[in-house]
């Protein structure tokens, strides 16, 4: 409550009698007011705050205790902690594997989410004997930290804490097709050293464009000997199978307490409450699902998700994430081959009672729900899963096969690469090809990684479509080297999501929006050059919609150029009519389309860029922003090389100078990428 202040000088009068009388009255009013306020404060407010103050102290103490990972390590006898920055679950999986490794060397490890702890506590780590901190850090997007490592990254940038005595190691997860390969891992490794921490093993750089699993195994098999040498310890024995979770079967449980696919809060899908994010997705109804292309070879689709009443806000260039479900046919086949009743309700409870992660996925739930909504059953399993499963193969040759692929030998790595990775064998295929391998379904559920959200560039502008989010995607289906037909989880699931008819129920998609740096220029007059073949055109549909909307508002809008590519005009020309209309209306200044298969020689977007190089250079010199969306492995690299050539030729520069010129555009936010591999 604010203090009251009365300026009595304004009451001065020429008549002394009136002045005295007035002052007396004012004093009485002030005195009464002060007495009243004091009475209220002591008798009422104080009583009301006595209990809340005590409660707040308790909460604060609890929060501090939980955020101090060093105190937790002391309490539980741990000396190794592995933090993970993970967007898709792989870094978390690697962290779990490293923490489990520790027991082989007479140590105790724990994996941890940096979002759950105060990393300033690192300076206290030397209080624990033979303490080591390891970071498994993935790089997301264009050199960004993952969502759960953002606070840690911000802290590293701002802090000047002395980390002398802290022993550390870093393994980074990245992709060489991206411009900023492993930026987060490199930054954490460098910054920790700058703050005085001691690196006890070299930085590991995993490449998801190559063989990330092999990169990790190679680093890991050299990492542990270095740890042993540094701390003077020896391995206690061979790697052994240790269960992390205990199975509890619920024979009589209230159905209202069973998870049915929710990502966070129980029954959150029945009682939706904003704000919506990765841990609390919004169930959006599908209002449109139409095929964009004419050919039968591929299925490209446009979906619209209704976000009205969700309070979700997005901007052109943002990403929409959806949580898919696995194919029920695959789930049923898994249940059949394992001889399991998929409708049994169970919980997997962490045997480590001190762990923050009580279950590998929301529990209690049924095996059917876990295999449908929570577990990844379509990606090739990693080597640690094969090692754990090998014990359940009754046929010696199959057990040997699995153990060899899980080994660090050159022969084992090659076998894993060819038999699992390149053949795209998922867990069901492995069980089918190893007839004697029949693990308990609960252990399999413990071993399989979590099914992750899928991200798509939003193909709409919130200025035009504030109550819906649009998705453009190609349905994935292919034949493996082993002759099986594999289908993309999310795209096939989305394909089946038909808008509700008169008598049908609504088709719902759990979703949330992730903010992006892929943004239109602040000034509408700034020219934009957009390059996006295939489904890479998605964010540019939103960009063009927004520029068209600005024109309708009477705003001056700069040149808007699109370089789009597809196979044939009559097969996969996405949004053909919409783009043509934008061009006719003047919202799209130039519409340049490369058809790669309509003539004897291939024509790609970079060829069209070269043809327009003089005009493009003029726009770039005039402050234009360049946007590239689509395949990172080939297209984005070729387009970037083309811009190097354009800058070198028309800017009269050496190649190195042209490269530096484009790099500076990236730094200034004038050359933006939204790419995938």
UniProtKB/Swiss-Prot annotation:
GO molecular function, one term: enzyme activator activity
Domain Flavodoxin-like: 80-224
Binding site for FAD: 424, 454-457, 472-474, 478, 488-491, 676
Cofactor notes: Binds 1 FAD per monomer.
CDD domains named among the record's database cross-references: CYPOR
Membrane topology field: Single-pass membrane protein
Family in the record: Belongs to the NADPH--cytochrome P450 reductase family.
Name of this chain's protein: NADPH--cytochrome P450 reductase
Species: Homo sapiens (Human)
Gene, per the UniProt record: POR
């Amino acid at each position: 409550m604010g203090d009251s202040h009365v300026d009595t000088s304004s009451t001065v009068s020429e008549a002394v009698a009136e002045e005295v009388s007035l002052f007396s009255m004012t004093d009485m009013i002030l005195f009464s007011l002060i007495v009243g306020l004091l009475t209220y404060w002591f008798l009422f407010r104080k009583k009301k705050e006595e209990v809340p103050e005590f409660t707040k102290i308790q909460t604060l103490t609890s929060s501090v205790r939980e955020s101090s990972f060093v105190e937790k390590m002391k309490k539980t006898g741990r000396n190794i902690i592995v933090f993970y920055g993970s967007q898709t679950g792989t870094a978390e999986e690697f962290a779990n594997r490293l923490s489990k490794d520790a027991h082989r060397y007479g140590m105790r490890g724990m994996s941890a989410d940096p979002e759950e702890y105060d990393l300033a506590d690192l300076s206290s780590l030397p209080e624990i004997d033979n303490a080591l901190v390891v970071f498994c850090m993935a790089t997301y997007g264009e050199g960004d930290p993952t969502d759960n490592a953002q606070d840690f990254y911000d802290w590293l940038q701002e802090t000047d804490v002395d980390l002398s005595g802290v022993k550390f190691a870093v393994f980074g997860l990245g992709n060489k097709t991206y411009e900023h390969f492993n930026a987060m891992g490199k930054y954490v490794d460098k910054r920790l050293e700058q703050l005085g921490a001691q690196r006890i093993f070299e930085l590991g750089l995993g490449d998801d464009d190559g063989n990330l699993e092999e990169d990790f195994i190679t680093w890991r098999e050299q990492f542990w000997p270095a740890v042993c040498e540094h701390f003077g310890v020896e391995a206690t024995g061979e790697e052994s199978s240790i269960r992390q979770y205990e199975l509890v079967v619920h024979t009589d449980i209230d159905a209202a307490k069973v998870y049915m696919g929710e990502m966070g809060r129980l029954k959150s899908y029945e009682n939706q409450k904003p704000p919506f994010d990765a841990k609390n997705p919004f169930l959006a109804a599908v209002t449109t699902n139409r095929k964009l292309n004419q050919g039968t070879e591929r299925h490209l689709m446009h979906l619209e998700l209704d976000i009205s009443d969700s309070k979700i806000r997005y901007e052109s260039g943002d990403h929409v994430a959806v949580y898919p479900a696995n194919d029920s046919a695959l789930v049923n086949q898994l249940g059949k081959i394992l001889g399991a009743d998929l409708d049994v309700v169970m919980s997997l409870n962490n045997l480590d009672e001190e762990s923050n992660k009580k279950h590998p996925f929301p529990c209690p739930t049924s095996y059917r729900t876990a295999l449908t909504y929570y577990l990844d059953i379509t990606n090739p399993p990693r080597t640690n899963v094969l090692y754990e499963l090998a014990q359940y193969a009754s046929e010696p040759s199959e057990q040997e096969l699995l153990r060899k692929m899980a080994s660090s030998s050159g022969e084992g790595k090659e076998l894993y690469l060819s038999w699992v990775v390149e053949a795209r064998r998922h867990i069901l295929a492995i069980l089918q090809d190893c007839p004697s391998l029949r693990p308990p379904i609960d252990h399999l559920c413990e071993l399989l990684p979590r099914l992750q959200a899928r991200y798509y560039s939003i193909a709409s502008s919130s200025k035009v479509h504030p109550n819906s989010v649009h998705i453009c995607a190609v349905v994935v289906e292919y034949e493996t080297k082993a002759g099986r037909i594999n289908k993309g989880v999310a795209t096939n699931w989305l394909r089946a999501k038909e808008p509700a008819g008169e008598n049908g129920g609504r088709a719902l998609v759990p979703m949330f929006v992730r903010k992006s740096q892929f943004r239109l220029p602040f000034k509408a007059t700034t020219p934009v050059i957009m390059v996006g073949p295939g489904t890479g055109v998605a964010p540019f549909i939103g960009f063009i919609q927004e520029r068209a909307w600005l024109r309708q508002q009477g705003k001056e809008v700069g040149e808007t150029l699109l370089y789009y590519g597809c196979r044939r005009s009559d097969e996969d020309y996405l949004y053909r009519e919409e783009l043509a209309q934008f061009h006719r209306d003047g919202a799209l200044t130039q519409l340049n389309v490369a058809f790669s298969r309509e003539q004897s020689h291939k024509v790609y977007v970079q060829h069209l860029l070269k043809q327009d190089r003089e005009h493009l250079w003029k726009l770039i010199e005039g402050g234009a922003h360049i946007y590239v969306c689509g395949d990172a492995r080939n297209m984005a690299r070729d387009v970037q090389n083309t811009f190097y050539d354009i800058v070198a030729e028309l800017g009269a520069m050496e190649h190195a100078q042209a490269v530096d010129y484009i790099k500076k555009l990236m730094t200034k936010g004038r050359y933006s990428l939204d790419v995938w591999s």
